């Protein structure tokens, strides 16, 4: 297989990758021309009974512990499917604001389930890419062609949902993993 991009996103129980857990994962593989390769993957992770999501996470994502119990895979099966996708040879794992969050969620979940948390990032010609830095660079060096939303402070907002809305990109449901992947 030639090199591919694997666009992915998580929804989680909170905002701290070291203590919070994944609720949902979505990923879509594309070729180097950004044409889809195969079907998207959307899976839920069954929360252990001793883990509760923050109320904000439930409100933001719409995912409740009960939903994960009904629809979710065990964490071991959940991360196994993700690992298979991200560790396929010549895969570039791509996310939006992923270096400080999604990649960390992946690493902690891999570690808890006895996988090497870093191998998928470099083995077999693999790599990863957080495109938020590309968006920031575009704003700094060539801002024409995009509408740049601003926070109430007047600073630019690089939130995916704000950029999508300002540029009339149909996002679907913000903070639903597959919708965020397709928007990215």
Task: Please place each PLM-identified region on the residue numbering.
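Metal-dependent phosphoesterase signature
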Residues: 61-78
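Short acidic, Gly/Ser-rich segments with clustered Asp/Glu that frequently serve as metal-coordination loops
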Residues: 10-18
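Short glycine-aspartate micro-motif
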Residues: 5-7
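Metal-dependent phosphoesterase core characteristic of DEDDh/y 3'-5' exonuclease domains
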Residues: 3, 20-25, 29-61, 85-183
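Short, basic/hydrophobic alpha-helical segments
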Residues: 75-89
